[in-house]
Swiss-Prot record:
The keyword DNA-binding does not apply. One of its GO terms (molecular function) is poly(A) binding. Residues 37-100 are annotated as: Disordered. This is PAN2-PAN3 deadenylation complex subunit PAN3. The gene is PAN3. It is found in: Cytoplasm. Regulatory subunit of the poly(A)-nuclease (PAN) deadenylation complex, one of two cytoplasmic mRNA deadenylases involved in mRNA turnover. PAN specifically shortens poly(A) tails of RNA and the activity is stimulated by poly(A)-binding protein PAB1. PAN deadenylation is followed by rapid degradation of the shortened mRNA tails by the CCR4-NOT complex. Deadenylated mRNAs are then degraded by two alternative mechanisms, namely exosome-mediated 3'-5' exonucleolytic degradation, or deadenylation-dependent mRNA decaping and subsequent 5'-3' exonucleolytic degradation by XRN1. It comes from Candida glabrata (strain ATCC 2001 / BCRC 20586 / JCM 3761 / NBRC 0622 / NRRL Y-65 / CBS 138). ATP binds at residues 378, 428-435, 482-483. InterPro entries: Kinase-like_dom_sf, PAN3, Pan3_PK, Znf_CCCH. The N-terminal zinc finger binds to poly(A) RNA. The keyword Nucleotide-binding applies.
Length: 717
């Protein structure tokens, strides 16, 4: 066509408006049809747009609107209702009005052939013709209607069918996150038809029913819009014709039965970032009745790694070592050579906090600036020491004690970092260690007490007392369940030993007969007997101070408790005498055998982890040289190159495919066998095949090892 016919073009929509939303040649005489030809410029009072009557029997598909122009909650009820006449073609009321597309009024344009984001189109059953006076589109009898089924996991609000049926209502962008939705937003609606407002006036009961819905269902922007969609569709249940059966059920089930999250932007199925390690993510050991009998040469994966119970215990200790708690007070950031104070006063009773000459004390986990290790700091409040040699002498005496059953002293100093003159005593830190009082009387579940455990406690405490008593000028003072800590299964240590000596030197006026060293040592044995008696009473579940009530305890242990707790020892007694007379070497050997067995077990586990560490270093070396970006264009890593063998070997170890099923092979035994042979450099030959099975190579593990070492050294030079 050389020249466009204006009479023909005036009924054709301008393509510029459809694509760009406006036509820049409109003022220059564009002959095509523009939607805003007859619409006046918008002012403060919106005007009614021109409408044209809908032809009879033509389906009017609503224009999809943007998120910003979606109607608010309860903004428009659904009023489409089928009639009993199946062949009705149109309603008998006023003519339905079809809006013209206004690019300026529409925030965005969405093709009608594609569903909105986060929705799925499903075909509903055939609807009959609508009731007269309905503001919805004119539907021909037997015409399938496409409803938008919302995706409850989408963060984009989805328009409801009721809102799609009334495209002539232009909504301003509303605050989707505000809970104050309701009739107030209806006052901001721009009515371009007039019939819609009349419909609200004719059906006040529907408006009041919709506006009475709860508006505080959630805080996210998608929840109120989804409630609006559910309620708009639920209005179809008031009609008298056939209903779309699956739509309402799926909508209600999506928000109620499936548990719609309150804020769809953050999925609720993921654990929070601060959650601790979940041990169930590891494959647990099967129950004993389900274990398969293995041959002598067979192994299971759990036999190649650290046992689950030991792994969990070690992981918990590491977690406790690095765990931080809020201080809850004005703690200093640095105390002498230590920083990062973490309070550890969990179960300290008032009698325990004031036990050092009526001075309060506090426990902290600290990090050393000297060696970076974690230590335990005990602070004794408000201690005045005029002679600094008292601290140095006490530290020199206690630093000589080296026993597996005594917590080692690491540092001793005075500090004013807490706002007063405090005494700081630093010991070795044992993560997850608890006192005997906490382990057997406070924590749940409590540690079970047995007679073998009591004998083990007695031998270990006597071993620690032997080391303390053999050091001249060292006394531990009172011994109770709070001073003895449980560091592992059946392993205990005597803690808080240096506090007694230094506080006696600082406050000599409070000493009565504490200067008698023999009485102090005998008092330690009496305290040991009282500890054993408390634990034995808990085991037998009996009360009172009569040893005869301990029915589940052997006579030998009863005799030991009676001799120690009720001061039936002679004045000059030592550890060797107690062991020889009341315990016996058979008990000592039994405890020593248990400790030896556990040491061998721990070394065996460590040896397996040592092999795993060797293989891990080998895997790291392979990954350092394999798959690097700069090697993609290197001819040495291509099929003709000499380093292509490393690529084939890597695929041979980790990327094998089962020829029968076509699935990847995850054989841990195959990986360990290949890596061990590679690390040893055996002469065994292997057949390496390319993925397309066109090229093969026969090479030994020794050659592959030499090639890997050569490539790694060349890369690190």
């Amino acid at each position: 066509m050389d020249k466009i016919n204006p009479d023909w073009a005036r009924d054709v929509p301008c393509r510029n408006v459809i694509i760009y939303g406006f036509c820049k040649k409109k003022t220059e005489g564009c002959p095509f049809k523009h939607d805003d030809d007859d619409i006046a410029t918008p002012t403060s009072t919106p005007k009614v747009a021109d409408t044209v009557p809908a032809p009879s029997g033509v389906i009017q598909q609503p224009s999809k609107i943007s998120v910003s122009s979606l109607p608010s909650l309860n903004s428009q009820p659904s009023s489409t209702a089928p009639t009993s006449a199946p062949n009705a073609t149109a309603h008998t009321g006023s003519k339905s009005q079809v809006p013209k597309f206004n690019a300026k009024a529409s925030a965005s344009f969405t093709p009608m052939s594609k569903a909105a984001d986060g929705t799925q189109e499903t075909q509903a059953p055939y609807l009959e013709s609508p009731v007269a006076g309905s503001p919805g589109p004119i539907l021909k009898a037997g015409t399938p209607v496409s409803f938008m089924q919302p995706n409850i996991y989408s963060t984009t609000p989805v328009p409801s069918p009721a809102s799609m049926a009334m495209p002539n209502v232009v909504m301003p962008p509303n605050d989707m996150g505000s809970p104050d939705l309701g009739l107030q937003q209806q006052s901001h609606m721009v009515n371009l038809d007039g019939s819609i407002q009349q419909n609200y006036q004719e059906r006040p009961n529907v408006l009041m029913r919709d506006s009475s819905m709860p508006l505080t269902m959630g805080t996210s922007g998608s929840r109120p819009m989804l409630d609006q969609q559910i309620h708009s569709i639920s209005g179809l249940s008031n009609t008298s014709g056939p209903q779309p059966p699956g739509l309402l059920q799926s909508m209600n089930g999506a928000s109620m039965d499936m548990g719609l999250p309150m804020n769809l932007r953050y999925p609720t199925i993921y654990p929070p970032t601060h959650s601790i390690l979940q041990y169930h993510l590891y494959a647990p050991d099967p129950p004993p009745q389900l274990e398969i009998a293995l041959k002598e040469n067979e192994r299971t994966p759990r036999m190649l790694f650290i046992p689950n119970d030991l792994r969990e215990e070690l992981v918990k200790r590491n977690l406790a070592s690095l765990q931080l708690f809020p201080s809850g007070g004005n703690l200093p950031h640095i105390v002498k050579d230590y920083f990062g104070l973490v309070p550890l006063d969990f179960h300290q009773r008032s009698s325990v906090k004031d036990r050092y000459k009526k001075h309060k004390n506090s426990l902290y986990k600290v990090f050393s600036n000297v060696d970076g290790r974690i230590y335990l700091l005990r602070r004794i409040h408000d201690v005045n020491i005029s002679d600094p040699t008292i601290i140095s002498k006490t530290f020199q005496k206690w630093s000589k004690i080296d026993s597996s059953n005594v917590v080692a002293l690491k540092d001793l100093f005075l500090t004013t970092a807490f706002g007063d003159s405090s005494l700081g005593i630093v010991y070795d830190y044992y993560p997850n260690a608890t006192s005997l009082y906490e382990a057997h009387f406070v924590n749940y579940p409590t540690v079970e007490v047995t007679e073998d455990l009591l004998w083990s406690y007695a031998v270990q405490i006597l071993n620690g007392l032997r080391e303390i008593h053999n050091t001249n000028g060292v006394n531990i003072g009172d011994l109770d369940c709070d001073k003895i800590i449980l560091t592992g299964k059946g392993r205990i240590k005597i803690s808080a030993g240096a506090e007694y000596d230094i506080m006696n030197m600082c406050c000599p006026e409070d000493n009565e007969d504490d200067d008698n060293e023999e009485k102090l040592r005998k008092r330690n044995f009496v305290d040991l007997g009282e500890i054993l008696f408390k634990l034995a009473s808990k085991m037998c579940n009996c009360h009172g101070k009569d040893v005869a009530n301990l029915a589940q305890v052997s006579e030998k242990l009863k005799n030991l408790i009676k001799s120690l707790a009720f001061e039936q020892l002679h004045d000059y007694v030592n550890v060797a005498t107690i062991i020889e007379k009341y315990i016996g070497l058979d008990v000592v050997f039994k405890v020593m055998e248990a400790q030896q067995t556990y040491s061998e077990y721990a070394e065996n586990v460590l040896s397996r982890e040592l092999e795993n560490g060797r293989l891990f270093r080998l895997i790291c070396k392979l990954n350092f040289i394999f798959g690097r970006v700069e090697n993609r264009l290197d001819i040495n890593w291509s099929e003709p190159g000499d380093k292509f063998v490393i690529v084939l070997f890597y695929d041979y170890v980790f990327h094998q495919i089962d020829p029968n099923t076509g699935k990847p092979v995850t054989d841990l035994t195959h990986v360990l066998r290949c890596l061990n042979k590679l690390d040893a450099g055996v002469e065994e030959n292997i057949l390496l095949v390319t993925p397309d099975e066109l090229n093969t190579a026969v090479v030994s593990y020794k050659k592959v090892k030499e090639l890997v070492d050569k490539t790694f050294r060349a890369m690190t030079l």
